Design a protein with these regions (language model features):
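S-adenosylmethionine/decaboxylated-SAM
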Residues: 42, 55-244
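Class I SAM-dependent methyltransferase Rossmann-like catalytic core
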Residues: 4-66
Length: 244
């Protein structure tokens, strides 16, 4: 039996997760220097051929930067979550997903996406995560509900793989970037635009992914250096070197 219990009344004391504070008012504070240091670490990791894939790159980045507290949005059956927990020394990893029976996007747009029910997938995720004890915390709720449970600048790492629609990805990046501390890492999956399987309107037409254009625009607007790492589909990431 799983030792992870989901409590709908859960309140996260994320003040305890903020390990580091950076005094950005200091005259010698150098945002670009922070980015350059992380880039140097990333470049060393990327020297290995296999390290160009997210399953290798992100665990090595997390360990190299000594990141301790993270959130993953869009967990499904916790395959990537369990990989991160296995390969890193991360101390708290919050796994956020609605675990719904259907995927919905937009107004009056609803399409069955999953072969198994939300409850089955949730139970599978909890079972897999149970091996990590209190390092893994599944949160069965929407991304926008979960984000209210964390203080600004309280997280080291966030990985976004939830709502792939234009509005959904924009809301996720905007909201969760505020929760990552200065010097932390914001990242996500499926860095692309175009059709996304399983997302259909009422007429059976595929609704487009809009992750690339939204991520590009957000980073350009706020002055973040956007990076990508390979795999079956690209992942994106940037250092939060200043407030958005």
């Amino acid at each position: 039996m799983s030792n992870i219990i989901y409590d709908e009344s859960i309140t996260i004391d994320s003040t305890k997760t903020n390990r580091k504070t950076v005094d950005t008012s200091r005259n010698d504070y150098d945002n670009q220097d922070m980015v350059d240091k992380v880039d140097a670490v990333a470049n060393i990791i990327m020297e290995g051929k296999k390290s160009k894939y997210r399953d290798v790159f992100f665990p090595e980045l997390i360990n190299s930067l000594d990141l301790k507290t993270g959130v993953e949005i869009g967990v499904d059956e916790a395959g990537f979550s369990s990989h991160i927990l296995t390969k890193t020394k991360i101390e708290k990893y919050y796994c956020v997903d609605n675990w719904m029976d259907e995927f919905g996007s937009g107004i009056n747009m609803r399409k069955s996406k999953f072969d198994t029910s939300g409850d089955v997938r949730y139970n599978n995720a909890v079972s897999l995560l149970s091996q990590f004890g209190d390092r893994a915390i599944p949160l069965r709720m929407s991304s926008m509900e979960a984000v209210t449970k964390f203080n600004d600048n309280s997280l080291d790492f966030v990985y976004i793989d939830g709502d792939h629609s234009l509005f959904g990805i924009y809301e996720d990046i905007k909201a969760w970037t505020h929760k990552v501390r200065i010097g932390g890492i914001c990242a996500g999956h499926d860095y692309k635009d175009g059709s996304g399987s399983g997302i259909n309107d009422n007429f059976g037409q595929q609704l487009p992914y809009r992750i690339k254009c939204v991520t590009d625009d957000y980073c350009r607007k706020h002055g973040y250096k956007l990076n990508t790492v390979g795999g079956l589909t690209l992942s994106w990431w940037f250092v939060k070197n200043k407030e958005a």
